[in-house]
Each structure stands twice: as structure tokens, then as C-alpha cells.
Amino acid sequence: NGEQDYQWRTWLNSIRPLSANVPLATTLGNHEMYTLDWKMREPYAYLNYFAVPPNGNEIFNRRYYSYDFGDVHYVVLDTMLYESNHEDNHDTHHPDLYDVEVQWLRQDLAANTKKWTVVLMHRDPFRYAFDRPGASRDVGFDDEGVLFMPIFDEFNVDLVLSAHLHTYRNRGHVRNFDRDPSGPLYILTGIAGDARRPKWKQHPLDVYVAPQPETNNYMSMTVTPNKLIVKSF
């Protein structure tokens, strides 16, 4: 919950051994936009806690951004259009969030000169069908996938890491919404905490699904002159 102080303290204390030595590059998620009574608002606490790079936009400053580290260009997206415009959000609504962000993203990727490009986004671009009685949702691609994936194809993004569904899925390389070894590698990152969501059917593009019931897991990435090596534990 984005305004629950004890949750922030607990999480920040738990990562202190890491954050004391390694800079954090955070990605905005939906819970960072929740109030104490589970309404929605601007992510004020999140923006106050993390000094990520500016993006040049006064309204959406630091909600999405990019940075270079070694041979990798990292792009961190804001996928909170739904929360930014929800009827329970009593702050200023932002129906133009994705329009503004896409313009920035295209300019950012066009100027990129690094060997590797990695995108991080909270909402997963793939749409999974519910695996529970009485619930129905078509499998395919979410609105964020329909919008952003063609841009990732156009600028030859190498790796896309997403979250939100509390499960690990490796979809392999995808281009033009289909299996293609020349496309970006799409990995849905798994569970770092105790919130289990074992309610998703397998997607036709899944190449690996974590064993269920899923346990806590994390990922590492190693950059070599010729490879990006991603491992999940």
C-alpha cells in the first residue's frame, strides 16, 4: 500500500544490506498508487523515497525514466494508466500518460547507442486467462502489450522484464506477437514476497512455467561482451 508507512519501513529495512551498496532503480507499480483506504492517487510516497533520474516531463517526472550502465541501456516504464484515471482517484487524472510516454520512449530509444537494451515495466504485456471457476478472460495481450511491444520490435529491444501477476513465466523471444528468435526475450518475474497468485492458465507463448505451488524467487543478470545472461533462483 503506497501510503502505509510501516510497509515501507519493513521493505526498506529488509533490503538495506543490498541498498547500502548497490543503487536502486525502481519501477512504479499499482500498489504504490493506493491510499490507506484502498482508493487511488498520485504516487507521492514512492516519488519521495526514490531519487531516480528525471525524464524531462514536469507532470510525469521520474514515473518513467532511463539510464545507462556499462553496455546496457535500461528503460523503466510507467504502466499505471488505469490507476491514474480510475474513478476512485481523486487527484488529477492523466488520460494522456501513455501518449506522452510513448513520445518520450521513441526519442529515448532512437538516441540509444548501447549494445544492449533492457526494458522494465510493472504490468505484464501478455494477457493470461484466469484458472479458477466462474472467472473468464481471454488469453492474448494486454493493452500495454498492444501499445509497447511493436515499439520494442522497432527498436530491437533485447530483454523485457515485467511483474504484477505474482508468478514466473518465461515466454522466450517474441516479435510481432508471435514466436520469433529475433524478437525481445520476455520474462514475467516471480514472487519476492508472500503474496501468491496461482490463478493463471498457461499462455500459448509460455516456454517455462514455475512449478506450483510457486516458492519465493529472484533473478540476476550478468552482462558479458556477447551475452545477457539471466538466471532465476
Regions found by a protein language model. Give the residues of each.
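Active-site glycine-centered loops adjacent to acidic/histidine catalytic or metal-binding residues
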Residues: 1, 29-30, 122, 163-164
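Short acidic, glycine-rich surface-loop motifs adjacent to enzyme active sites
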Residues: 1, 112-130
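Extended active-site neighborhood of metal-dependent phosphoesterases/phosphodiesterases
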Residues: 5-113, 134-142, 147-148, 159, ...
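Short active-site segment of divalent metal-dependent hydrolases/proteases
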Residues: 32, 125, 167
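General beta-strand recognition
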Residues: 73, 229-231
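Transmembrane beta-strands of outer-membrane beta-barrel proteins
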Residues: 78, 231-233
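Metal-dependent active-site segment of extracytoplasmic phospho-/sulfohydrolases and closely related
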Residues: 120, 157-169
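A conserved, positively charged/aromatic
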Residues: 152
